[in-house]
Every structure is written in C-alpha cells, then in structure tokens.
Amino acid sequence: MSELVRTCGYRYGEIAVITGNLEEYARLAAQVFEEADIPYFIDEKHSVMMNPFVEYLRAAMEMAVQGFPYESVFRYLRCGMSEVTREQADKLENYVLALGIRGYKKWSEKWVRVYRGMEAEKIQELNEIREIFAEEVRELAQGFGSGKKTVEEYCRILCEFIQKSNVWQKLKRQERKFKESGDKAMEKEYNQIYGIVMDLLDK
C-alpha cells in the first residue's frame, strides 16, 4: 500500500481493504496500519455495537421496557459492566429460573423461598447479590415503569443511570489494559465509546 502511494501516485484515501469478516480482522488491520504509520478508517459500526458498554445499555433498556424478564436481566448482568460479577450472576440464575422471578418488584423484595435441593443458608448470599442489582437499577426501573414519556425524557433517565454507575471507570480500566497489551484499536475504542454514547443521548 505504501509502495503504491510512493511510486504510483495513489493517495491513501483512494485505497480500500475489503474483508468478509470485519469482526475478525478489524483489530489486526488497525494494528498493522498503526505500526506502518498508514492513515486509515475502519467502518466499525457492527463491532462498536458489540462493545460491552453498548451491549450493557441495550440490555438495560430491554430489561426495563420488558418488565425485567429472565433473559434480558441476565444479558445485562453478563455484560461485565454491572456491579454484580458474572460469578454472582451464575449463583442467582438457578434460583431465578426455579422460582420464576420476573419484574422489578420481585427483585426489590427480600427472597425467602427455597427450592427443592437448595441449601437453605444460601438464601442470605442470594439476597445480598439481589440487593446490589435492585439498587443499581432502581431509578431505571422507576423511570421506565412510570407511564409514557418523551424520547428526551427516556434519554435523560439513561444518562442519569450511566452517570451514577461505575461504567466510566470500568471503561478506563479496560482502556489501560489494551494500552498495556499494545492493542491500539481497542484502546482507541474504549477511549471514545463513552463520549460517543453520551453525545448521542444528549442530542
């Protein structure tokens, strides 16, 4: 590519690299271009949608709109952005499935029932995890569950939800990890994604 620019009069903007699997090759291509000091643009609409922060917000909205069903609750919990760890989410899952827990009201109330084969003393630990989740999403549940609102109002609720969470700090930690590992493409994505999302919600 550099040879074409140097010897044939091409400009970098006139050269395209096409792949049938952007998700697999985008990061590798970005690293190669960075190392070769070649200016580039990657159309990463799909991969950005797969960013854990974006997935976290999509799951949060789906969860609130649909009334906290099992599928969207655990999709949210497994994005890696919640204060509930994935290990803790795994501990909740069997209980939620066994007893059909659905709706924010059920998540906000103390659990006392024990299903067959469950060790009774585990209910205390499950309640501690439940409380973390219930408090984390309380204002989101109240905001989305209290009547129809304008798009602007929903965006404000989401902005407040994001700002009160520790998502920004988690994104920064991931950004540092990618920087340390030399993954410049992912470092850049994690550096920019918070601002991009907040700007969109602000508009």
How should each PLM-predicted stretch be described?
Residues M1-K203:
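Polyanion-engaging groove/track-forming segments
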